[in-house]
Regions:
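Oxyanion-binding/catalytic loops of NTP- or PPi-dependent enzymes
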Residues: 1-75, 79-85, 94, 101-363
Length: 363
């Protein structure tokens, strides 16, 4: 039997995973990393570049490079990184194909089937677009799994403790919150809520906008490459605040160099509107699941942006308990998909596990 792989098709990064030797195993790419940036760039001679080399061109060739296209899956919006236009599912197929090729090289066998994760709040057209992306990449999409559901399976498989779990899945471009009832070998999704237009990238844009406003610079004054550099600096600032109390951010506009100092307190004040949106999503999930904050035994953090200390501090404030940060938040969904592959392949140690997923929209 050919291996089935799990693909966490992310807004910012994508990962591959397989179930073998009794565990879910992440698949490294050609650069030795588990994370493949969900970025596509077109060179001047029409060649398409995917992953880290494409991400490197976001700064040098922003007009020929596209990212965060997953958010527009199923909308009909097109992107033009060069002379040709691409739908989001066409761009996503290139990322999927890259993951599949890395898996084939790593496992030494052909891959024809995959289980792919999507935000829980993706509607039917978006889910169909993901399946189409798989078909364009030359693989059969065996199953679509909600991202927080995969994270819940990975967490429960490790802890194996009966509990009411809330999965807080905060990626680069989307937020999903799921309430999960875990018992015996059952992982049952009780409710889901989400915002497909809210993610860690919004904090980058927020920092960039406040930086420009502080220095009286209009967004229109920046060339595309200057704004790309500014966003990169904002992302760097956000990440450094995970390690430092204070960060100095620099950016050049025209021939003028500007700088601002950021602290966690300042970021919290400037992020209040985004944090309010996060709280609203959590509130909807709790209401739909007929639970209160006090009914939640464990909060599981998933998605790369949930690593932000600001986010973890806010979740701790809301639930009055520390959330569970299991290993690398970037990898939890992919590991869950690996387990789904193990269930599908009837692997002895996991074949009895059942994941009951739900779709928040009528199909």
């Amino acid at each position: 039997m050919m291996a089935v792989i799990g693909i966490d098709l992310g807004t910012t990064n994508s990962l591959g995973c397989v179930y073998r030797n009794g565990k879910a195993e992440l698949i490294p790419n050609a650069y030795g990393s588990y994370l493949t940036p969900s970025v596509v760039s077109m060179t001047e001679d029409g060649k398409l570049i995917v992953g880290q080399p494409a991400k490197d061109r976001l700064i040098t060739h922003p007009e020929r490079t596209v990212s965060s296209f997953k958010k527009d899956m199923g909308t009909g919006r097109s992107w033009k990184p060069g002379e040709k236009s691409f739908l989001p599912e066409e761009l996503s197929s290139l990322v999927i194909r890259s993951i599949v090729e890395d898996a084939q090289n790593y496992l030494g066998e052909e891959i024809e089937e995959a289980v792919i994760s999507v935000p829980a709040y993706f509607h039917d057209e978006q889910r169909v677009a993901v399946k189409r992306a798989g078909a364009l990449a030359g693989i059969h999409v065996e199953r679509i799994v909600n991202e927080p559901s995969a994270a819940a399976l990975a967490s429960y498989f490790t802890a194996n403790e009966e509990q009411n779990m809330l999965v807080f899945d905060f990626g680069g471009g989307t937020l999903d919150v799921s309430l999960v009832d875990c018992f015996d070998t059952m992982v049952e999704i009780v409710s889901v809520a989400g915002n497909n237009r809210l993610g860690g990238d919004d904090f980058d844009r927020l920092i960039a906008e406040h930086f420009l406003r502080e220095h009286g610079v209009a967004r229109q004054q920046l060339r595309a490459q200057e704004y790309a550099v500014l966003l990169k600096q904002a992302e760097r600032c956000k990440k450094l605040l995970s390690e430092q109390d204070e960060v100095v951010m620099h950016a050049t506009v025209g021939d003028q160099l500007y700088e601002s100092t950021y602290t966690m307190d300042r970021l919290f004040e400037e992020s209040k509107a985004l944090l309010k949106e996060i709280r609203q999503v959590i509130g909807r999930a709790l209401k739909d699941g007929k639970m209160t904050i006090h009914d939640v035994d464990l909060v599981v953090m998933a998605g790369g942006s949930s690593k932000m200390p600001l986010i973890q501090k806010y979740i701790r404030h809301l639930f009055h308990k520390a959330p569970m940060v299991q290993g690398n938040c970037d990898e939890l969904i992919a590991l869950g998909l690996g387990l789904v592959c193990g269930v599908k392949e009837r692997k002895e140690e996991i074949k009895d596990y059942i994941l009951t997923d739900i779709c928040p929209f009528s199909l």
